Amino acid sequence: MFNLNNKGQSLVMFVLIIPIFLLIITLIYDVANAIYEKDRLSNTIWIAIDYGLDNINDITKEELNDMIISNVDGLNYIDVIVNDNEIVVKASKKVKGIIGKMFHFELTTINCNYKGKLIDDKKEIERIVWLWQVKL
């Protein structure tokens, strides 16, 4: 009877699927970026505590604070406590991804708390709290 042309249907399906596909790619990028920033903050704190424990007699709170701030951009909160044989670092950072930039909100907040001790000239560094909050 009628000879139907399916090219229009394919075009409509393509136009409907492209935004969904782009949204999925953007979400994957945002999550990967948040994981990268979490690892960067966590590793920087760990290295700063390791360095501080190596130089426990000479290091000051301000030097460790400056070391962390110079290696991690956009910290919201940082607290460094240096005691006799113990260093505690608490830091927080907000990560804004592509979706957050489009809609003006922070997608994730990363909190890292580490504690390092010298026990019989042996270093022990432990993670106290590691929190990754997603705010939608």
Task: Kindly give the residue locations of the regions a language model identified.
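Alpha-helical assembly-interface signal, strongest on the long, hydrophobic N-terminal helix that forms
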Residues: M1-L64
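Short, conserved structural patches
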Residues: N55-L136
